[in-house]
């Protein structure tokens, strides 16, 4: 498990969330388009980037990486209060902290965002994103949502 309360990880995850919202893209697609090198750059420079409003940083990243918009708008589809960018950044960061080793954080960021769990975390009409961090991490490890499975006999 990597270090808890990793500010660079929290900011990087929040920035990917902001990029997804700004571009109307799935967060996994944003991470895939940034690639490991792009995520590494954002992660390494998070202590500087966080000094500006996240919306401006997102605009700069969109320009720098020539990111194009999509048609995924989970905010418009939400029937309930939408969690803010920082809340979702914290959810992703905690999951990555729980499933990553200290030396492969950037690789794990890419793996988590591009995995099956991204669609569950991006569904703000479901209860998944605000489940306990241990539960979300175990679902990720098991590669399935454990919430609706029946207990073994």
Please provide the spans of the model-predicted regions.
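N-terminal interaction modules that seed assembly of large macromolecular complexes
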Residues: 2, 14-62
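Conserved small/polar residues in nucleotide/adenosyl-binding loops
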Residues: 148-153
